[in-house]
Amino acid sequence: MSTPAVHIENLSFAFDTATFHFGDAEVRPGEVVVLLGPSGAGKSTLMRLLRGELDPLEGAVHVVGEPVKTRKKILVLDESKAGWVPQLDDLQPMLTARENIAHHLLRLEEEEREQRVDDLVRAMQLQGQDQLPVRALSGGKRQRVSIAKAMANQPPVLLMDESLAQLDLRTKTSILIDVKQMVRDAQIAAILVLHDPSDALMIADQLWVIKDGALVQKGKPEDIVKAPESHAIAGLFDHINVVASTADIPGPWRLDGEEKWLFAHELPALEGAELLDSYTTPSGSLRRIRWNGYDLLQK
């Protein structure tokens, strides 16, 4: 089995009165991990720990087997370890897209530098626009340049913290598809914070769900959708995880005056359910049960 590109071990961080416990996790080359969770959950804090901006309270982050050094120990973050794409680009507007990418490759011989830039221009679909000043490019193209720039030194890890949040759906989807392909081709690891769970399901090999400063569930997207560990996690995918069915059955279908939603993950295990009533319908028998405060229909 390949060495993890990223390995976090017993990772925690404290800030004022807030404490974050991220525990253990790893990302392998060729994988895309997406962080999901509500605002303020700790996604950006975890990204800053991965990048080396913050010192952990406990634990460590390793990139390709080597511990990540923090900004306090070195003046400049090591971009050969992790490429970083911020939400708002930090490109030089007067330089061309190509010059912005090449700026991080000044130590290479000219021929090698030009070949590397050509490869990144193709990977990010910037052909024909790489000679334009970035101030003349659209927001989507600028972010493509930012991704190419982040990958200029061929780091084993790409980090993107809501870098595509300002883009329209079509542009964002197109970029995510190209990022996924680049990750596979280059066999790097990518960790992204995305706002929309639909985007996460499209691109992620793994999902890490962050809530209240903790990594509460991680795994393949399809596994988390099928078996979320809490109502809050199920709610992230409510467009696909709510059981969309109704039945014209007499009786009270409200609890404390409010309608109750039923999530798919609640169906398989109904231990301790209380039988309230049973009905015979043309399509078969139904049982009305109470389980964990919910009134449910069960065939």
Listing of model-derived features with the role each one plays in the protein:
Residues P133-L137, K141-Q143:
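Conserved ABC ATPase signature
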Residues D212-G213:
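Conserved ABC ATPase "signature" C-loop
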Residues E112-Q129, K180-Q181:
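Conserved ABC ATPase "signature" region
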Residues S44, P250-K299:
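Non-catalytic connector elements of ABC transporters
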Residues A152-P156:
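A short, proline-enriched helix->beta-strand linker immediately N-terminal to the Walker B motif
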Residues R51:
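Helix-to-loop junction immediately C-terminal to a conserved catalytic motif
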Residues P67-G83, R107, I224, P228:
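ABC ATPase NBD coupling module
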